[in-house]
Design a protein with these regions (language model features):
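Ser/Thr-rich, low-complexity intrinsically disordered terminal regions
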Residues: 2-10, 19-172
């Protein structure tokens, strides 16, 4: 009986440590947990996907493409400038003719690598969009890390003077 109680105590400790690490991982990414589509949907997404991609009409406002008033070539230069300012980001390939680049983000503690593809896409009306796709190389759930990469690059673009407009969802 003592062995069973000790094993149950150990199991409880492992569960508590796991839940604490999970909470710290998600909270450490400073994600907008209470924003639409809500905490439950976000938690489920962060635990079960390792990809974050900007998509028109995304239920996650931070994952909607942003439009800019800069010409596409100037905006692509700002994207490269913004990435250069981000810690642990490295541009590994850049194609000026198509305004696309591939960057690798290396995590601080375990040195995990995430791939981020960024494109500046010209739009009718002259307001190019920045679209992104961030993918973890390891694991099934990224705890929102790739969403954080998208948010970090959009924030860095603001810092270098490229001010974007987020597509607004219509209220129905």
């Amino acid at each position: 009986m003592r062995i069973v109680l000790r094993l149950l105590g150990l199991l409880l400790l492992v569960v508590v440590v796991f839940v604490a690490m999970l909470a710290l991982g998600i909270r450490g990414n400073h994600l907008p947990m209470d924003d639409p589509p809500g905490s439950f949907v976000r938690l489920n997404t962060y635990l079960n996907t390792h990809v974050a991609e900007t998509i028109e009409g995304s239920p996650f406002p931070e994952l909607r493409p942003r439009s800019y008033t800069l010409p596409a070539d100037a905006l692509f230069a700002k994207v490269k400038e913004a990435i250069a300012r981000l810690p642990r980001w490295e541009i590994v390939e850049s194609k000026d003719d198509t305004r696309q680049l591939h960057a690798v983000v290396t995590s601080g503690l375990f040195r995990f690598k995430d791939d981020v593809t960024v494109s500046v896409v010209p739009q009718p009306g002259g307001k190019p969009q920045v679209t992104m796709r961030a993918v973890s190389r390891v694991g099934k759930g990224d705890l929102g890390t790739n969403t954080r990469h998208v948010m970090d690059l959009y924030d860095a673009l603001e810092q270098v003077g490229a001010h974007g407009e987020v597509e607004r969802m219509s209220s129905r």
